[in-house]
A protein has these predicted regions:
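Outer-membrane beta-barrel signature, preferentially recognizing the C-terminal barrel domain
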Residues: 376-379, 422, 451-505, 522-534, ...
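Short acidic/polar hinge/loop motifs at secondary-structure boundaries
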Residues: 71, 97-123
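Extracytoplasmic beta-strand/coil segments of soluble accessory domains associated
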Residues: 43, 66-98
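Short, acidic, small-residue-rich periplasmic hinge/interaction motif at the N-terminus
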Residues: 20-56, 78-79, 87, 119-120, ...
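Face-selective signature of the C-terminal outer-membrane beta-barrel domain
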Residues: 219-245, 267-413, 436, 440, ...
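N-terminal periplasmic accessory domains that precede
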Residues: 33, 65-68, 102-103, 117-118, ...
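Outer membrane beta-barrel strand-and-loop segments of large Gram-negative receptors
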Residues: 328-332, 383, 473-475, 479, ...
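Surface-exposed extracellular loop regions of Gram-negative outer-membrane beta-barrel proteins
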Residues: 137-152, 244, 249-253, 305-309, ...
Length: 690
């Protein structure tokens, strides 16, 4: 008999163990969480959902939710960021509510995970910009009273970084109170060179620069809230404050052609803060209909002061100041009920987003071609959606439809720009059909139409000074993209196949080209493009005793003509993840990966033949104390170089990232719990764009 587990993408606030007297029915409740079968696979395909069970596996003692996700099929975690192969960054839900920041995954213990589900064809309920969804279910805890967790980490790469987090909760009767506070000091160092070659005034020209970036920053988070439940109704709210201070420095040089390099230093001081408040309500009507409401408010502000100074005479200091303010109001209301022997969900969602950017160039000469300016964007969005799911015999069917109205307004120096402002009506359908041959063999096919909205920083009209001959900027004329995605997903025993073909219209990519100015200037900025792409991944994953391997091979191939050239070299990649249970309760993870050189949009990335990460962990004092030692890029073989060839400008960027290092993490828990705020972001996609 085997206890198997379903696992996939992202995770929730801290879930903690408790000491003290158990409720009399705790054993019954705990047994209800465990499924015991003779041949249940560790990872299985249910319709278009890949399910991984964590409870009872080697993965449950890895440390945090991030550690577990890094070992799951089609999942990758790098520097705390979760991604899905061929899909990019997923939306993560923990116990039905969305994750709002990466700290939730760091604070969630792997021993509190029950299962992880990966949706590669999410329906209309998740929004038309969502390509993948990770749903994490935690093990239920029934403890009352006080819970406490403290996690401290120290990391040494080229520089030292450290963080400390304290999480506390208290529950009595129907009321739960929780609070979290953390402070982190990050520091990194990136070295590299950038060389641009082009034809200018009928002659070959070269513009180059060297970089030695130091990026220390201090980040704080304070969060507090409550949950209250009574019978079939529950409600809650929380508030989060997030200040941040960064003091960046870049020392290097600039040159053109055969001239001697000019030494320069770029200093940038960034101060930002954000406030977020959220409320929710859940109601179960007549035992059949679930009613859910979420409301979200966010306000943030930041100030960035940049000064570029040159050691040689004849070059004046170039300084600028940028002030940015943004706000978001959003609401979401939906109801779920049984319909035609299936599950039906319908609802509405709205949001209002306002962003104001005031950019001031303080150098008069540079201001002739990089002017000061005030830009504002306002977006109103209203959506209605419906989703129906049903399983009959060996078939599973899911169909959905989403309508969205978007009113986007762009103002430049107090005047509305009608060429950029627009109103859109979007109708996006999705459908998925799956068939199960047996417990370990199934297949599904799905189609989804979705939209791709550029992040708000890419929609600004301001330009930024990068060097004597280089500029970077946004593009307020960027249009929302449309994406058609046809996908086949299959599983046979321990093998998983995921193949998708995407046709993207008006997605965006970066290009570099000549900028009209009195002197030679190059500008890098985003533009709309049309691209077709094929993703193909084959995974083998099957636990074998104390060893849990996961081997993935894949290929990405795109068809793109942009910037006066073709970008269609395929990228082949592999991932070999291993978890081994050692004696004395220790766990060892060893992960290797690599990829060939190839094109992704207008960028051609370099080859990494082999890179290795590893970690070892152990729990002490009845799992109250966890100790973990991890190492990244052990042999320093990661290749972060990339090139771009657009509009007659050939750019080669060689850079050495700060990835090689060692981290020690200590986690102490006293009566930890999994329960936290039960609501979800009313407009998570707008929060991500901000």
């Amino acid at each position: 008999m085997h206890i198997r587990i379903c696992f996939l993408s992202a995770l929730l606030p801290t879930v903690f163990l408790a000491s003290g007297e158990e409720p009399s029915d705790s054993l019954v409740r705990e047994l209800q969480e465990i499924v015991v079968t003779a041949d249940q696979p560790a990872t299985r395909l249910e319709g278009n959902v890949l399910v991984s069970t964590i409870t009872g596996s080697n993965l449950q003692n890895l440390g945090t939710a991030l550690d577990v996700l890094a070992q799951l099929p089609l999942m990758k975690v790098e520097d705390g960021a979760v991604s899905v192969a061929g899909k990019g960054i997923p939306d993560v839900y923990i116990d039905g509510r969305p994750m709002r920041d990466g700290d939730e995954l760091r604070n969630l213990s792997s021993s509190d995970l029950k299962k992880v589900e990966l949706l590669l064809a999410p329906g209309a309920m998740y929004g038309n910009t969502t390509e993948a969804v990770v749903r994490i279910t935690t093990r239920k805890r029934f403890w009352k009273g006080f819970s406490f967790t403290n996690r401290a980490a120290a990391e040494k790469r080229r520089c030292w970084s450290a963080s400390d987090m304290i999480d506390a909760g208290w529950r009595s009767g129907n009321l739960e109170l929780f609070a979290t506070g953390s402070v982190s000091r990050y520091d990194s160092r990136i070295k590299g060179t950038t060389v641009n070659r082009l034809e200018y005034d009928g002659e070959e020209a070269e513009i180059g620069s060297s970089q030695d970036n130091r990026a220390p920053s201090t980040v704080g988070v304070v969060k507090a809230g409550f949950n209250f439940s009574s019978g079939a109704h529950s409600a809650g709210a929380y508030y989060r404050y997030n200040p941040e201070h960064g003091d960046f420095c870049n020392e290097g040089s600039e040159w053109t052609g055969t001239t001697a390099p000019v030494r320069r230093r770029i200093d940038r001081d960034i101060r930002s803060r954000s406030h977020l408040a959220a409320v929710y309500y859940d109601g179960n009507l007549a035992g059949k209909c679930l009613l859910h409401f979420d409301g979200t408010f966010r306000r943030s502000s930041s100030t960035s002061a940049t000064a570029t100074t040159y050691a040689e005479e004849g070059y004046a200091e170039v300084s600028s100041v940028e002030k940015k303010n943004s706000s978001l109001y959003a609401g979401k209301l939906y109801a779920s009920l049984p319909l035609f022997k299936g599950d039906f969900t319908t609802g509405i969602q709205d949001s209002y987003t306002h962003t104001r950017l005031d950019y001031r160039m303080l150098n008069q000469a540079v201001g002739e071609y990089i002017p000061s300016g005030l830009t504002e964007t306002r977006q109103k969005s209203l959506a209605a959606f419906a989703q129906w799911n049903r399983t009959f015999h060996r078939f599973s069917l899911s169909a959905g439809l989403r309508y969205e109205y978007v009113d986007y307004a762009f103002d430049k120096d107090g005047r509305r720009d009608n060429d950029v402002s627009r109103r859109n009506h979007l109708l996006t359908p999705d459908i998925s059909l799956g068939y199960s041959f047996c417990d370990d063999a199934s297949v599904s096919i799905s189609y989804k139409m979705s939209t791709e909205k550029p992040p708000y920083p890419q929609l600004t009209g301001s330009l930024n000074y990068v060097g004597i001959h280089e500029i970077e900027g946004g593009n307020p004329a960027l249009r929302d993209g449309r994406m058609h995605n046809l996908q086949v997903f299959g599983m046979w025993r321990g093998f998983i196949l995921q193949a998708s073909f995407m046709r993207s219209i008006d997605t965006y990519a970066f290009v570099k080209e000549l900028y009209p100015a009195p002197t030679l200037q190059l500008m890098m900025h985003p533009v709309n493009i049309d691209v077709s792409a094929l993703n193909l991944f084959l995974v083998w994953s099957r636990p074998m005793g104390k060893w849990t391997p996961n081997f993935t091979v894949g290929v990405y191939r795109q068809w793109l003509e942009a910037g006066g050239g073709r970008h269609d070299r395929p990228i082949f990649s592999y991932y070999l993840d291993n978890v081994v249970a050692l004696p004395f309760g220790m766990l060892l993870s060893v992960n290797a990966h690599g990829q060939t050189s190839g094109d992704m949009h207008t960028n051609r990335f370099g080859t990494t033949w082999f890179a290795l990460d590893a970690s070892i962990s152990r729990s002490f004092f009845n799992e109250s104390l966890d100790v973990k030692l991890s190492a990244t890029d052990i042999f320093g073989t990661l290749n972060n170089d990339w090139t771009m060839d657009t509009y007659g400008v050939s750019m080669v960027k060689r850079q050495s990232y700060d990835r090689r290092g060692v981290t020690l993490t200590l986690t102490y828990r006293f009566r930890p719990r999994a329960s936290r705020y039960k609501g979800e972001a009313a407009s998570q996609s707008e929060l991500d764009r901000l």
